[in-house]
Amino acid sequence: ILME
């Protein structure tokens, strides 16, 4: 999971 990649979040910004």
Curated annotation (Swiss-Prot):
GO MF annotation terms: pheromone activity
GO cellular component: extracellular region
Keyword annotations: Pheromone, Secreted
Tissue and organ expression note: Follicle, fully grown oocyte and egg(EC2).
Record's keyword annotation contains Secreted: yes
Subcellular location: Secreted
Role summary: Has myotropic activity targeting the genital tract.
Protein name listed in UniProt: Pheromone peptide ILME
Organism of derivation: Sepia officinalis (Common cuttlefish)
